[in-house]
Amino acid sequence: MLNWDKEYLKLCRKILEEGTVVENRTVNNTIKLPSYSFTLNVKEEFPILTTKKLFSRQAFLELLWIYQVQSNDVNWLQDRKVSIWDEWKIDDKGYWNAEQKVKNPDGTTSIGEVHKYFGEEYKGTIGEAYGFITNKYHGVDRVLDKIINHKEDRDNVLSIWYNNHLDKGVLRPCVWSHEVDITNGVLNMWVHQRSCDVPLGLPFNVTQFALLMNMYARVANCEVGTLSFSIKDAHIYENQVKQIKEQIERGKFLSIYEGYKNTDWLEGQLERYTIEYNKIYDTLSEEEKSNLKKGITPDVIREVMTIKNVILYTLNPPKPELYLNPDVTDFYKFNNDEECKDAKVLNYKDLGRLYIPVSK
């Protein structure tokens, strides 16, 4: 199992075992830890989850949208078949609509429709947030100047938290700043997050900032080192608990089967569980088969499918590495078309999709 998978599952277990249930603006309560931090060695291992499928193309394009293209236009993502921000897109009349908890006159709360008006000039965007901020305040240009001309400086910080813009964006920045340090030719990064949807957001965030630090390192002509995350309010929504428990279960089976070194025995077990999986699969309804492709696993087949996938993983373990086009040294010239051909994860393998709902 990869180091990032181990760290991630440790955090998930800690939230479920020690977290506090709290209400929030969405219709789903969260289980939260007030703070959490970790450090990953990106030089030794490119961090991408394998205990569930991570769509790196979409993750990379979102990162480029914010820091390279410096845009708040959701259409840019949609043109590249990235739907991450669809739920937060301001409509053609200038409204953003959501179902959230609202306070009643008597002080109680209920679920209601929220319609926030931003203005027609913001249609198709997320308002004054993320890429809007990086563009307006030229934060990336400052980072690039520092890593090229002032490597020794201790103030290489990029923040996208500006109080005068917070109410003009649909969503306030979750990852709100990062810092860069170069020492002895090694670039390290610290990422600060005020709120973290651990099942959905964190897997993307870690892989994205691992890409960003590699892009910075390319520009600065240095190596990558460690990536550190500091999180306030690390949480799991209550409607995500079942899926996270399934992912934790995958990790448990993986820990068990990785201990077996007898390849012949593992291949025999693979044949056994494949036959059993096929038998159960044939009994599923068409709806269940369709859901399975989306990452919604019927209980009747979950354990057998997990063990089969774990054995396949164990027989040929993944060794993910980042391919970053070696011919590109200009931060703004890395390809950001739909294919995202200048940045790819090689040698990646996962234990299958998990459908995890969004709360907004």
Task: Give the role of each language-model region.
Residues 1-360:
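Terminal, non-catalytic protein-protein interaction segments that mediate quaternary/complex assembly
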